[in-house]
A protein has these predicted regions:
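Acidic catalytic/metal-coordinating carboxylates
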Residues: 35, 61-65
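Short amphipathic alpha-helix used as the core "switch/output" element in two-component signaling
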Residues: 64-76
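Recognition helix of helix-turn-helix DNA-binding domains
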Residues: 159-192
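Conserved acidic carboxylate
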Residues: 8-10
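Acidic, metal-coordinating helix/loop segments flanking the phosphotransfer/catalytic sites
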Residues: 32-50
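Active-site residues of response regulator receiver
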Residues: 54-56, 83
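Short, flexible helix-to-coil linker/hinge segments that flank and couple to helix-turn-helix
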Residues: 91-95, 99-145, 202-203
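Basic, Lys/Arg-enriched C-terminal extension of HTH/homeodomain DNA-binding domains
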Residues: 182-217
């Protein structure tokens, strides 16, 4: 039996994966957790063989940081990132952290179980492209890389000056790209851009709570 830990803070997705795996005869679920740092501590004392990890979860670290720590601690553990986040940069970071496979929460039961089974057999499964979402009148896959980089930082609450410094481009360039984003999407201002992008799960919002989860569910 393969011991599986689910790390997911959204109840509906957590229970969906629990139900799906409980129907399979060769997977044994240990109690799920909603915080990535709790998952790391749990795996220190439990012989977990597979972790289904969300990226944006509760606790003092996100799913990508937890993946790197788990792989350092137990190189043979299999970790599948199962996420609704569509940020290409985030998925690249997850892969670099050591994730064995990455898949999306809205996948069919058959597709998700196929990824899980193949990962346990030693394969690495990664989506070819992030699904496109509509931001106003525009599809996210029509944005340039620089537009995506700037929009990501707008979602994370940075000012134009801060974006300029972080991306090492001029403030005028930042404003020009924001103007293009507003024209493409038909949205009235950068606040509307941030709200639409956040609602579409286009980027991870880098806002951590002050304290990790205390209880294991």
């Amino acid at each position: 039996m393969t011991k599986v830990l689910i790390v997911e803070d959204q109840r509906i997705h957590r229970e969906y994966m629990e139900t799906l795996l409980s129907q399979e005869g060769h997977y044994e679920l240990i109690p799920s957790v909603t915080a990535a740092d709790v998952a790391v501590q749990l795996c220190k004392t439990n012989p977990v063989q597979l972790v289904l990890m969300d990226i944006a979860v509760n606790g003092m670290m996100d799913g990508i940081e937890a993946t790197a720590k788990l792989k350092d601690m137990s190189p043979n553990i299999k970790i599948i990132i199962v996420t609704s986040m569509l940020d290409t940069e985030c998925l690249v970071n997850a892969k670099e952290a050591g994730a064995d496979s990455i898949w999306y929460k809205d996948a069919s039961e058959e597709a998700l179980m196929d990824v899980i089974d193949r990962t346990m057999q030693g394969e690495h499964i990664f989506p070819d492209n992030s699904p496109a979402v509509h931001i106003g009148f525009a599809r996210s896959d029509k944005f340039t890389k620089t537009e995506c980089d700037i929009l990501r930082e707008i979602v994370n609450g940075l000012s134009s000056r801060q974006i300029s410094e972080k991306l090492d481009i001029s403030g005028r360039t930042v404003d020009w790209h924001i103007k293009n984003l507003l024209e493409k999407t038909g949205l009235p201002n950068r606040t509307a851009l941030a709200i639409r992008a956040a609602k579409g799960n286009l980027f991870v919002i880098k806002d951590k709570p002050e304290q990790g989860e205390k209880n294991i569910k």
